[in-house]
Amino acid sequence: MTSSYRQQLQAKIDRITTQFSEFTPPTLEVFESPEQHFRMRAEFRIWHTENDMFYAMFERNGDGKQKTVVRIDEFPIADKSINDLMPLLLAELKANSLLSQRLFEVDFLATLSGEMLVTLIYHRKLNQEWEQAAKALAEKLNIKIMGRSRGQKIVIGDDFVVEEFELLNRSFKYKQIESSFTQPNAQVCKKMLQWACDAAEGSKKHLLELYCGNGNFTLPLSLKFERVLATELAKSSVYAAQWNIEQNQIDNIQVARLSAEEFTQAYQGEREFRRLQEADIDIQSYDFGTVFVDPPRAGIDDETLKLLQGFERIIYISCNPDTLYENLKTLTQTHRVTKFALFDQFPYTHHVESGVLLEKI
């Protein structure tokens, strides 16, 4: 482990340990990231000069008001497959004006399974000639390509990749859609999945999951419970979760297209939802003992926190220590922290991913 990586990780450990000390958690479990090639996503501007074009990012000056263009020829934090593809793709784009004209951004979405989706974003309308050139490029480089411009989306192959993780003595396949959120650090994501499954060990009754996304945690957690009800509001994520459940041949998960707030209303009988009836979901048929939550950065709303306090076990994955801290002030009135983890999902940044298991007092 290099000193620069160790220093940034230790700073996060110190910060989290101090911030959460009032909840008297057990010893912090720390899950490190690879030091390089850990990001499965990368986005670059394309900078055009009179006789050249290159990948670029912007560096803000001290006052934050001005930005300097930084040429990017390699990107060590991105997956090796992205780094290998970058010069090959750029050479092909430069050689074909149909593909390079008014191109202003290139996004990469890679997987451990070997699939790659490249999104080319333009400041011009894309025509049939562009589509033919993009098809030839996709075939030559063995990648999927998507072209975007204002009000236009052209898909060459698929607008998604399929990731595959080995976990709990089996393989899990995940559809990851170009425009939807996925965990960017696949190696740390696998560690998070394993930790969540370990936290669920010995759980009884059924599992409720809020904010399930594409079913990232839902699939492996389903092996630990007799029945699982997962909720998610975004339609594209719900469709991806349902595809993932079917592809992985798992038969004990139902997905409800509800927000956390809406689920609380439905569970407490305050409101009926046609979406539940259409999906043939009877919330009252579940006997929940554990709830799993992986909320957005804003954390969990007050009504949902009250709902969580009724569960025997709460497994909470957080991408924002500050909102986790605020939420724990409420949850530790009824529960105690019995597992505490830090996942270095975003090395070399101030961002921290953490996990807690809370059990009823």
UniProtKB/Swiss-Prot annotation:
Residues that, per the record, bind S-adenosyl-L-methionine: Q183, Y211, N216, E232, D294
CDD domains for the chain: AdoMet_MTases (cd02440)
UniProt-annotated catalytic positions: C319, E353
Keywords noted in UniProt: Methyltransferase, S-adenosyl-L-methionine, Transferase, tRNA processing
Annotated transmembrane regions: none
Recorded superkingdom: Bacteria
InterPro entries: MeTrfase_TrmA_AS (IPR030390), MeTrfase_TrmA_CS (IPR030391), SAM-dependent_MTases_sf (IPR029063), TrmA_MeTrfase (IPR011869), U5_MeTrfase_fam (IPR010280)
One BP annotation, GO: tRNA methylation
GO MF term (any one): tRNA binding
Pfam families: tRNA_U5-meth_tr
Catalyses which reaction(s): uridine(54) in tRNA + S-adenosyl-L-methionine = 5-methyluridine(54) in tRNA + S-adenosyl-L-homocysteine + H(+); uridine(341) in tmRNA + S-adenosyl-L-methionine = 5-methyluridine(341) in tmRNA + S-adenosyl-L-homocysteine + H(+)
EC number per UniProt: 2.1.1.-, 2.1.1.35
GO cellular component, one term: cytosol
Record family assignment: Belongs to the class I-like SAM-binding methyltransferase superfamily. RNA M5U methyltransferase family. TrmA subfamily.
Function: Dual-specificity methyltransferase that catalyzes the formation of 5-methyluridine at position 54 (m5U54) in all tRNAs, and that of position 341 (m5U341) in tmRNA (transfer-mRNA).
Protein name (record): tRNA/tmRNA (uracil-C(5))-methyltransferase
Organism classification: Bacteria, Pseudomonadati, Pseudomonadota, Gammaproteobacteria, Moraxellales
